[in-house]
Amino acid sequence: MKRAILGVLRGIASGAKKLVTLPASAISSARNRSMGAKSDAKSTWAVIGLGNPGHKFDGTRHNVGFDVIDAIATIEGIAVTSAKCRALVGVGKVGQCTVVLAKPQTYMNLSGKSVRDIMKTFKIPRDRLLIVYDDLDTPLAELRMKMSGSHGGHNGVRSIIDDATKGMKDFARVKVGIGRPKDSTTPVYEYVLSKFNDEDAAKMIEAVNEAKKSVTEVLMENNLSDAMTRCNSKFAPKKVKAPKRPKI
């Protein structure tokens, strides 16, 4: 498992511009399983990672959502290679749950148009939609899972609320922390489109692995609430005990 995650993120750690690809035999096998997987709206989830298309964005902070989808796809043997709904899409099984994995190929600010098409094509209700994306306000390599909320300044999520969910904010999301730039004069747009240094890349390997596990738990158990509780508890700020008062 760790080897697969390392493969997915090797573009982050080394600055390479190509993400991991499955062997041809594995892609063929996964595609056959995907074609045979029927979409049942009662049990089908759409897990959509946000990012920007094109190799020049591989390994950037803003593409962490894509990295999580690649990690899930690699471990579960789902080929996310079908071009539809303005995205790269793969359909398969995780446990007994049918899942649509997707990476919108619009640019980040237009992600909602692709998400809208995916929801319509695969008949995905909002309570079976899970969005994975980078978050500036979550500390580096930490995770937060939420059942609803505002866009928090993230243009991809803003687009989903505007274009896909008709203003409704009650859809699940996994926020992968990228932190704020250490230099406050660095423009945010430059920061999110930059690549991780080696030290941060090592931390992000673990973060992507944790995000993959959290998403897989949701799908295996068909239960968002329990997975969210476990994830958020793991990354909850540790309480600092007050020093004991000396006895008088």
Please give the residue ranges for each predicted region.
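Short glycine-enriched, charge-decorated loop/helix-capping segments at active-site entrances
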Residues: 144-150, 191-196
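Nucleotide and nucleotide-moiety/phosphate-recognizing core
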Residues: 2-148, 158-175, 181-187, 208-238, ...
